[in-house]
Amino acid sequence: MARILIIDDDDQFRTMLRQLIERNGYEVEEAPGGKEGIKLYRENPTDLIITDLIMPGKDGIETIRELKKDFPDIKIIAISGGGRLGPQDYLHLAKMLGAQRTLTKPIQLPELLKAIEELLE
């Protein structure tokens, strides 16, 4: 069973995402921020990471940069609802840093599941 790490500071969103992903046969780990997510990944790597981009502390952009530097083959889906610049600017930057897929919040479940399946093939 593939393992997925969700990094997002929004507890409700993380819980909802976890339930949806688990219902589709995946094992899920959670972290409330980039710093915690990186620590968790270093201790027990997962097959895929789904990370929000706009978070307090170590944001998703910094998280992707650090993980890709140390683990170049890591598979990452970046998600964003926007912020001051708008979601497309953050998602474009995440893609440039190595995120294989980018999705805009609110997440469309079929689109997310398709991205997960493609990356875990």
Residue spans of the language-model regions?
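Hydrophobic/aromatic residues positioned on beta-strands within the core alpha/beta folds
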Residues: I79-G81
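Short amphipathic alpha-helix used as the core "switch/output" element in two-component signaling
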Residues: K39, I61-D73
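Receiver (REC) domain active-site loop signature in two-component systems and cognate sites
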Residues: M55
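Active-site beta3 strand of CheY-like receiver
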Residues: N44-I50
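Helix N-cap/capping motif at the beta->alpha junctions
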Residues: E30-K39, G60
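Active-site residues of response regulator receiver
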Residues: D8, D52
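Alpha4 helix (beta4-alpha4-beta5 surface) of REC/receiver domains from two-component response regulators
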Residues: E62, G83-L103, P110, K114
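Two-component/phosphorelay signaling modules centered on CheY-like receiver
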Residues: D11-E29, L97
